C-alpha cells in the first residue's frame, strides 16, 4: 500500500466566514468612495494625489451604551408636567444615575426649547384652572354668594338701627325741652348795645370788684371813670387822643427838619474843606511834574 505524506512546509487552510465588523467596515469604505466628488479634468497631478487619506478612528457603540441612552431618554423625571411647571419654571429635575429610581437630588437648567414648551404648558394650565370649574365647586360658590348677601343685609339693617338710635334724643334732652312750670317774671331789655349797663342789672355794686387787687388807687379811679362814660364821651375821648397823636407827629417832623438843616450846615463846611484840600493837592502835583521835567532836561543836556 502506498502512504501519502504531507510536506512539513505545507499547511492546510480552512475557510472561515468574515465577521460582522469587517463587513460593516467594507460597506462604510465603499460608501465613502462612491460619495467622493469627481476630480476636475484640468487639475494637476500632485505627488500625493494617489495617496490614500488616513481613516479617522471609528468609535464603536456597544450595546451597553445604547441601553444607557434609551434609559436616559425614557426617564420619566425629564418630562415636564403642567403642575410642575408652575412651581419650577426654569428648572428640570434629573437623576445622577439613569435607569435607577432615586429621589430628586439636583436640578438642571432648561434649554430654550424646553423653556418655550414649559411656558406654553403653564399658560394652558392657568386657563384650565381659571375657566374649568368642577361640579362640586359650583354649588359651593353659590352658597358663598348667598352667605355674603345675607351678611350685607344684616350689616345694613344694623347701620339703619344705629342711625335711628342717634336721631332719637336722650332723656336728659327731653327733660330740658319740657316747659318750666314757673319761669318767673320777664326781664325787659331797656339798654341798647352801645349803652352802658346798670350795675344793678349785672349784679355788681361797683366796677371796682372787676379790677384786680394789684392796681393802684389812681388807676382804679381812672378805669372806673372810663367804664362809667357814655358813648358820646367815648367818641370825644377818642378824638382827643387822635388830636394828641397828630400834634406829636407834627412836632417830630419839625424836629427832623431842623436837624436836617443843622446837618446841612455841617456838611457844607466839610465839603468846602474837602474842595480846598483837593485844590492844594492838584497844585502840589503840578509843581512836582514841573520839577521832574526840569530834571530830565538837565540830564539830557549833560
UniProtKB/Swiss-Prot annotation:
GO terms for biological process: cell wall organization; homologous chromosome pairing at meiosis; homologous recombination; reciprocal meiotic recombination; replication-born double-strand break repair via sister chromatid exchange; synaptonemal complex assembly; synaptonemal complex organization. Residues 35-46, 162-171 have a biased composition (Polar residues). The keyword Nucleus applies. It holds the Pfam family ECM11. Keywords: Cell wall biogenesis/degradation, Nucleus. Residues 56-67 have a biased composition (Basic and acidic residues). It comes from the Eukaryota. The keyword Nuclease does not apply. It is found in: Nucleus. GO terms for cellular component: condensed nuclear chromosome; nucleus; synaptonemal complex. Residues 1-67, 162-187 are annotated as: Disordered. InterPro entries: Ecm11_C. Transmembrane segments: none annotated. May be involved in cell wall organization and biogenesis. Interacts with CDC6. This is Protein ECM11.
